[in-house]
């Protein structure tokens, strides 16, 4: 895996490709939110698991805008299944406490749960609950 800072104005979150007989995943960290970077990583891992890197295809993840829709939808479903293996059946309200409960029930961080709920259109992107989500750098600083 390789990290390359996002290009100014660029829209690339990640790329998966092959070099000799090995897959390579490149992440830009674009957006910096931990949930977004984690999903980009899992999306590119799904391309690798599905063997796309072996076909001489470079898989570029630009916020879901690249690649044929059928392939990208399958890759997104696989990546999402790794985050929420049992799917998502929201039962709590969407207050911070409700999201924390839902995240705990699903074994993910509240930041990841917020990102999934936003991606599913269940809570808006401009939601108050997402304003203070940690960046990747902030999240890594808490690991010890």
Question: Which role does the model predict for each range below?
Answer:
Residues 1-144:
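Active-site hotspot residues in diverse enzymes, especially metal/ion-binding acidic/histidine motifs
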